[in-house]
Amino acid sequence: LNDVEIEDGTVRIIYDENGAERRFEKINANLSLPHLVDPLTAKGDFDWKNTRVGFDLKLSTPADLESRSARIELALDTEAIDAKFDGNVMSKPAFSVEGDLTAKSQSVPSLIAWMRKEPPTEAAVGSGELSSHIAWQPGEITFTQARFALTHASGQGQAVVTLKSPRPHLRAA
């Protein structure tokens, strides 16, 4: 797969036997993976929740995912947020990610509305930035060395988000 071009593609991820799914549509991308032991690079854009998302991905060696972690660099660019992640990803024994995240949004309320599928809201929060070391394991995301800045507030600390239904639980200090 030296040079692959995807035009107007769709990816459906089906989560369970009930057919719960997530769709990524209108995918336009260029990717390269000469061999499974070579780096995977992919760059392009797609639609998610009616918003164009640009991406740039580098994965050190996909073959490593069979038995150990692989290095990953991912940048996402939307109207709602610009984010970069640099770290490691594992697929076994369970999916996990650990590394450094930086993100910047011109409108935190619009970002939250986009993530939750709700119409944009007006609020005084305004823009925001976040940087943190994160560890994402099944059922939990841990933020350490976290720093955030909003229009009228800033802070630092750590947090753990427990991903349980019906709502996630946040503990922070």
Task: Label the predicted regions.
Residues A42-G44, L57, F85, G99-L101, ...:
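Membrane-embedded beta-strands that build the outer-membrane beta-barrel scaffold
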Residues W136-A172:
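Repeat-solenoid scaffold signature
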Residues I112-A113, E122-G128, S132-I134:
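Extended non-catalytic domains of envelope/secretory-pathway proteins
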Residues D8, Y15, L33, A103-S107, ...:
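Residues on the solvent-exposed faces and adjacent turns
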Residues L74, P119-T121, H133, Q145:
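Beta-strand-rich interaction surfaces with strong enrichment in secreted/lumenal proteins
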Residues V11-I14, D82, V108, S154-Q156, ...:
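Short beta-strands and strand-coil junctions in structured, solvent-facing domains, enriched
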Residues A29, R116-P120:
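Extracellular loop and loop/strand-boundary signature of outer-membrane beta-barrel proteins
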Residues L1-V97:
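Elongated, acidic membrane-bridging lipid-handling scaffolds
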